[in-house]
């Protein structure tokens, strides 16, 4: 899904703000170069929001979780270009 005009995309690329890496490509890059660094962390009150303990995920753990979610979506028949809705509180899973 593309949400920006062709003119804006060209402008941002020309300025160097946007490149060719996808969001998952950037995650994969950080997982390869900084595998054990903290990528995402829940806020301390996660238990109040979900009943679960706060999560802290390294870039490698986030990359694996992202791959797992992608596999589950493909298994459910969701493919590239399909629009989906995500509704979650402000928790680590929101970035997967």
Question: Where do the PLM segments sit?
Answer:
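Flexible, non-catalytic linker and terminal segments flanking ANL/adenylate-forming cores
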Residues: 1-25, 43-45
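Conserved AMP-binding/adenylate-forming core of the ANL superfamily
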Residues: 17-19, 36-95
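Generic structural signal for hydrophobic residues
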Residues: 26-27, 69
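A broad detector of short, well-ordered amphipathic alpha-helices
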Residues: 28-29, 64
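Flexible acidic/glycine-rich loop/turn elements at helix↔coil and beta-strand↔loop transitions
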Residues: 29-36
């Amino acid at each position: 899904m593309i949400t920006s005009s062709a003119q804006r995309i060209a402008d941002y690329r020309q300025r160097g703000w946007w490149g060719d890496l996808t969001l998952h490509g950037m995650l994969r890059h950080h997982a390869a170069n900084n595998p054990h660094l903290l990528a995402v962390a829940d806020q301390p009150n996660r238990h109040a929001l979900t009943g679960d303990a706060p999560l802290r995920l390294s870039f490698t753990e986030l990359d694996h979780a992202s791959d797992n979610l992608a596999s589950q979506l493909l298994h459910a028949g969701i493919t590239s270009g399909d629009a989906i809705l995500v509704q979650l509180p402000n928790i680590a899973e929101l970035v997967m």
